[in-house]
C-alpha cells in the first residue's frame, strides 16, 4: 500500500536531484555517499526529534529503507 505524503512529488524529486548533484559534483563514491547521508539522518533525528521519539523514528526510517530496497541484481 503506497504511503500518502504531505509533500508533492515535485518537492521530493527536486530535493533528491539537488542532493544527488552535490554528491556527484564531489565525485563521492557509494560508501562515502552512504556515510554522509547516514550522518545527515542521524543529525536530523538528534537535532529535530524529541529524545523520547528518536528510537521509534530511527526504527521506522530503517524499516522504510529496507522495504524500499530492490533485490533485483540489475542496476
From Swiss-Prot:
Signal peptide: none
Domain of life: Bacteria
Transmembrane parts of this sequence: none
SUPFAM superfamilies, per database record: YejL-like (SSF158651)
Classification via InterPro entries: UPF0352, YejL_sf
Family: Belongs to the UPF0352 family.
Protein name: UPF0352 protein KPN78578_25810
Species this protein is from: Klebsiella pneumoniae subsp. pneumoniae (strain ATCC 700721 / MGH 78578)
Lineage summary: Bacteria, Pseudomonadati, Pseudomonadota, Gammaproteobacteria, Enterobacterales
Amino acid at each position: 500500500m503506497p504511503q500518502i505524503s504531505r509533500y508533492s512529488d515535485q518537492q521530493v524529486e527536486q530535493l533528491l536531484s539537488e542532493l544527488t548533484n552535490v554528491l556527484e559534483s564531489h565525485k563521492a563514491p557509494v560508501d562515502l555517499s552512504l556515510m554522509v547521508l547516514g550522518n545527515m539522518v542521524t543529525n536530523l533525528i538528534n537535532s529535530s526529534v524529541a529524545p523520547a521519539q528518536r528510537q521509534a523514528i530511527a526504527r521506522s526510517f530503517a524499516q522504510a529503507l529496507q522495504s524500499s530496497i530492490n533485490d533485483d541484481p540489475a542496476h
